[in-house]
């Protein structure tokens, strides 16, 4: 019996090969960057891309955003055929645009259209950071301007969801010009008593944050969204000081009076419905402070 203990055959565990490790289809699981929990992507999508464990708000593409907000089958897109060119002859720019078109099934970094939210008509623009990081080039600026003009002509509110790394460097000063163009269009719309609602999502930075994203009658943001003009390290190096940990977050901006509210994605549609209803029928906004 004692002899058997020392002569017992060793057992070995089999280690999966590299090929076996890759048998899990890409994209079926998603890891939360905040709490590190791994979850099924389809379950995350069902939860409007909000982590079920820590409430982290993952980026949404334009299609997902529109489906989560607009009344069913009410959204009609316009100007979807507009395509960016390469006015400065920037090397490789057209190839990058084509690659993003194939990856996202979008022609540009913003989707614009008209539909209803809770039965209330509105023109909506939704930026998509998966296309050139949501950067603002000539076509993005033109589509947003045309959407504002459409809202003005139809006398309906204009709602924009921003997600952008800023102006598109491959278009140089032409992209920077979109800051003035979109801001001017919003000014003219506002003079006609048009309602402007801006919702800043992660990330909203650079020239976008410094122009139309901050010009709403109501400026909202999603929890944890990065919002700012220059990068954190650049600011610290310029002023020679360490910035607060929560600097440039939605919560920091709310605390310092630069936002009207930080709204959880679950509450976004109802909040917009209430606002649109209030501006159509009259009322107060005390509920927004709850």
Curated annotation (Swiss-Prot):
<keyword id="KW-0863">Zinc-finger</keyword>
<keyword id="KW-0444">Lipid biosynthesis</keyword>
<feature type="domain" description="CoA carboxyltransferase N-terminal">
    <location>
        <begin position="28"/>
        <end position="290"/>
    </location>
</feature>
<feature type="zinc finger region" description="C4-type">
    <location>
        <begin position="32"/>
        <end position="54"/>
    </location>
</feature>
<dbReference type="GO" id="GO:0071768">
    <property type="term" value="P:mycolic acid biosynthetic process"/>
</dbReference>
<comment type="subunit">
    <text>Acetyl-CoA carboxylase is a heterohexamer composed of biotin carboxyl carrier protein (AccB), biotin carboxylase (AccC) and two subunits each of ACCase subunit alpha (AccA) and ACCase subunit beta (AccD).</text>
</comment>
<dbReference type="GO" id="GO:0009317">
    <property type="term" value="C:acetyl-CoA carboxylase complex"/>
</dbReference>
<comment type="function">
    <text>Component of the acetyl coenzyme A carboxylase (ACC) complex. Biotin carboxylase (BC) catalyzes the carboxylation of biotin on its carrier protein (BCCP) and then the CO(2) group is transferred by the transcarboxylase to acetyl-CoA to form malonyl-CoA.</text>
</comment>
<keyword id="KW-0275">Fatty acid biosynthesis</keyword>
<dbReference type="GO" id="GO:0016743">
    <property type="term" value="F:carboxyl- or carbamoyltransferase activity"/>
</dbReference>
<protein>
    <recommendedName>
        <fullName>Acetyl-coenzyme A carboxylase carboxyl transferase subunit beta</fullName>
        <ecNumber>2.1.3.15</ecNumber>
    </recommendedName>
</protein>
<feature type="binding site">
    <location>
        <position position="35"/>
    </location>
    <ligand>
        <name>Zn(2+)</name>
    </ligand>
</feature>
<feature type="binding site">
    <location>
        <position position="32"/>
    </location>
    <ligand>
        <name>Zn(2+)</name>
    </ligand>
</feature>
<dbReference type="GO" id="GO:0003989">
    <property type="term" value="F:acetyl-CoA carboxylase activity"/>
</dbReference>
<keyword id="KW-0963">Cytoplasm</keyword>
<dbReference type="InterPro" id="IPR034733">
    <property type="entry name" value="AcCoA_carboxyl_beta"/>
</dbReference>
<keyword id="KW-0862">Zinc</keyword>
<dbReference type="InterPro" id="IPR041010">
    <property type="entry name" value="Znf-ACC"/>
</dbReference>
<keyword id="KW-0276">Fatty acid metabolism</keyword>
<keyword id="KW-0547">Nucleotide-binding</keyword>
<comment type="similarity">
    <text>Belongs to the AccD/PCCB family.</text>
</comment>
<comment type="pathway">
    <text>Lipid metabolism; malonyl-CoA biosynthesis; malonyl-CoA from acetyl-CoA: step 1/1.</text>
</comment>
<dbReference type="GO" id="GO:0005524">
    <property type="term" value="F:ATP binding"/>
</dbReference>
<feature type="binding site">
    <location>
        <position position="51"/>
    </location>
    <ligand>
        <name>Zn(2+)</name>
    </ligand>
</feature>
<feature type="binding site">
    <location>
        <position position="54"/>
    </location>
    <ligand>
        <name>Zn(2+)</name>
    </ligand>
</feature>
<dbReference type="GO" id="GO:2001295">
    <property type="term" value="P:malonyl-CoA biosynthetic process"/>
</dbReference>
<keyword id="KW-0479">Metal-binding</keyword>
<dbReference type="Pfam" id="PF17848">
    <property type="entry name" value="Zn_ribbon_ACC"/>
</dbReference>
<dbReference type="InterPro" id="IPR000438">
    <property type="entry name" value="Acetyl_CoA_COase_Trfase_b_su"/>
</dbReference>
<dbReference type="GO" id="GO:0008270">
    <property type="term" value="F:zinc ion binding"/>
</dbReference>
<keyword id="KW-0808">Transferase</keyword>
<dbReference type="InterPro" id="IPR029045">
    <property type="entry name" value="ClpP/crotonase-like_dom_sf"/>
</dbReference>
<keyword id="KW-0067">ATP-binding</keyword>
<dbReference type="InterPro" id="IPR011762">
    <property type="entry name" value="COA_CT_N"/>
</dbReference>
<keyword id="KW-0443">Lipid metabolism</keyword>
<dbReference type="Pfam" id="PF01039">
    <property type="entry name" value="Carboxyl_trans"/>
</dbReference>
């Amino acid at each position: 019996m004692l002899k058997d203990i020392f002569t017992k055959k060793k057992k070995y565990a089999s280690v999966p090969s590299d090929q076996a490790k890759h048998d899990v289809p890409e994209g079926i699981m998603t890891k939360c960057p905040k709490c590190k929990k791994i979850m099924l992507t389809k379950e995350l999508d069902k939860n409007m891309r909000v982590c079920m464990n820590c409430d982290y708000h993952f980026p949404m593409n334009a299609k997902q955003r529109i489906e989560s907000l607009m009344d069913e089958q009410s959204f009609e897109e316009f100007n979807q055929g507009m395509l960016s060119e390469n006015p400065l002859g920037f090397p490789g720019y057209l190839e990058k645009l084509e690659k993003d078109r194939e990856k996202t099934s979008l022609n540009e970094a913003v989707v614009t259209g008209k539909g209803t939210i809770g039965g209330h008509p509105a023109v909506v623009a939704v930026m998509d950071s998966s296309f050139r990081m949501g950067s603002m080039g000539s076509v993005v600026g033109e589509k947003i301007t045309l959407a504002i003009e459409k809202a003005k002509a139809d006398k309906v509110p204009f709602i924009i969801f921003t997600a952008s790394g800023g102006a598109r460097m491959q278009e140089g000063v032409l992209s920077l010009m979109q800051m003035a163009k979109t801001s001017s269009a919003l000014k003219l719309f506002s003079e006609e008593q048009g309602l402007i609602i801006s919702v800043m999502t992660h990330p909203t930075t650079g020239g976008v944050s410094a122009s139309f994203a901050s010009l709403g009658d109501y400026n909202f943001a999603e929890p944890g969204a990065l919002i700012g003009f220059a990068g954190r390290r650049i600011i610290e190096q310029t002023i020679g000081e360490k910035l607060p940990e929560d600097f440039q977050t939605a919560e920091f901006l709310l605390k310092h009076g630069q936002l009207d509210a930080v709204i959880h994605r679950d509450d976004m549609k109802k909040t917009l419905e209430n606002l649109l209803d209030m501006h159509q029928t009259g009322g107060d906004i005390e509920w927004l402070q709850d």
